[in-house]
């Protein structure tokens, strides 16, 4: 049978995701220690994607993230040591900044390879709003698993500055204006 001509079009992907992460915190002398708990991560991606053919999509994405571990810092109270060097340091406290230091909004370029039940996507972007830990470039690798014609499971990973593991993305996606042939 003949393969019908592909109708090039723009579709819109909306992904809502959540996750958790652990974090290392710098303690001043360049060393890191593990923060004692895990932190929530939640976000969204809104991506208009140009469908070039049966196998390839490209587009841009608006990416919003709440990262509960962003800009966490450690604090230790001063303590007195006697002349013999005796003294017990108090435990370190891990402090979270206000929510304005844990939100970011970024823009990324995306490319996706489309298969019958799966789509593999990559992206690179930069946060345009975000403070401290949330500044800089980020990279995304994602797997979309089709559930219905317009919904999919989204499993992805986010790196920061091509080296630092950031967070896992586990979510649900919706595709609007999908003219992909049935």
Model-derived segments and their meaning:
Residues 16-22, 64-68, 115-117, 124-130, ...:
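Transmembrane beta-strands of outer-membrane beta-barrel pores
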Residues 20-45:
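Surface-exposed strand-loop-strand hairpins of Gram-negative outer-membrane beta-barrel proteins
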Residues 1, 165-182:
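Outer-membrane beta-barrel "beta-signal"
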Residues 11-15, 57-59, 110, 119-121, ...:
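Residue-level detector of the transmembrane beta-barrel scaffold of outer-membrane proteins
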Residues 16-18, 44-50, 107-113, 141-147, ...:
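Residues on the lipid-exposed face of transmembrane beta-strands in outer-membrane beta-barrel proteins
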Residues 55-58, 115-120, 145-155, 178-182:
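Repeated loop/turn-to-beta-strand initiation elements of outer-membrane beta-barrel proteins
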Residues 8-10, 38-44, 101-105, 114, ...:
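Residues that define the transmembrane beta-barrel architecture of outer-membrane proteins
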Residues 26-35, 68-99:
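Flexible, solvent-exposed loop segments that connect beta-strands
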């Amino acid at each position: 049978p003949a393969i019908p001509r592909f109708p090039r079009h723009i579709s819109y992907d909306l992904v809502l995701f959540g996750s958790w992460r652990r974090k290392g915190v710098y303690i001043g002398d360049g060393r890191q220690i593990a923060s004692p708990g895990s932190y929530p991560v939640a976000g969204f991606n809104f991506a208009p994607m140009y469908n070039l053919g049966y196998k390839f999509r490209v587009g841009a994405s608006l990416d919003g993230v709440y990262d509960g571990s962003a800009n966490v810092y450690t604090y230790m109270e001063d303590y007195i040591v006697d002349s013999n060097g005796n003294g017990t340091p108090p435990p370190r406290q891990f402090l979270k900044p206000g929510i304005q230091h844990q939100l970011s909004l970024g823009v990324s370029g995306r490319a996706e390879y489309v298969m019958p039940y799966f789509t593999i996507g990559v992206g690179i972007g930069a946060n345009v709003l975000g403070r401290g830990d949330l500044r800089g470039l980020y990279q995304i690798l994602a797997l979309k698993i089709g559930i219905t014609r317009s919904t999919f499971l989204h499993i992805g990973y986010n790196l920061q500055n091509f080296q630092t593991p950031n967070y896992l993305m586990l979510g649900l996606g919706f595709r609007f204006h999908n003219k992909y042939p049935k």
